[in-house]
Regions:
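N-terminal secretory/targeting leader peptides
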Residues: 2-181
Length: 181
């Protein structure tokens, strides 16, 4: 990525990431991105597969790397007081339905993304499905210490996330390399 101009959201954290990965962070609005790619204003961009497909970025970019650097989970939220007033049976229904909805949604996203990737590849885009993630990890291992990050994210949150990742890896024996973005 060294020296490439990559469209990013206007955010201090994205600018810090650019420094760690040695690319040029170029903030451009999403609505202007197609033209920026087409005219060579930027060399690349990062977006979910669905956004790349629906915005036809595959018409103006030749390469795509599935590095899984972000994941945007959806949350089911309910007032705890309301939940606690439900009967055990009603809570069990909600818990069961929540797990079913989560699993179904994840499979639907996986299936839809695979269809979109096939279409993107059919249009001639070279999709790298297994990039060298270790080089990304090494380049960003101290990102959380960057002043742009610490100004926005508390050390306690950072340590909590690191602990959760370590626990996941210990339980699952993997580094979570299969992202959706």
């Amino acid at each position: 990525m060294k020296g490439l101009s990559i469209r990013v959201q206007e955010s201090p954290i994205w600018f810090a990431l650019a420094e760690h990965l040695d690319f040029i962070a170029t903030p451009i609005s999403f609505n202007e991105l197609y033209t920026a790619l087409q005219q060579g204003t930027v060399d690349g961009q990062e977006n979910p597969i669905a956004s790349i497909s629906s915005s036809a970025f595959d018409e103006v970019q030749k390469y795509m790397c599935l590095d899984g650097h972000t994941y945007a989970p959806e949350s089911m939220i309910m007032n705890l007081d309301f939940y606690n007033r439900l009967t055990d049976e009603e809570r069990a229904w909600i818990d069961e339905a929540s797990v079913y909805a989560r699993d179904t949604q994840r499979q639907m996203v996986t299936d839809m993304e695979e269809e979109m990737l096939k279409s993107i590849e059919d249009k001639g885009v070279d999709v790298c499905r297994e990039p060298d993630l270790e080089s990304f990890r090494k380049a960003t291992e101290t990102l959380y210490q960057d002043s742009a990050v610490t100004a926005l994210v508390s050390p306690e949150l950072t340590e909590g996330v690191k602990a959760a990742v370590a626990q996941y890896e210990a339980e699952h024996g993997e580094k979570g390399e299969k992202g959706h973005d």
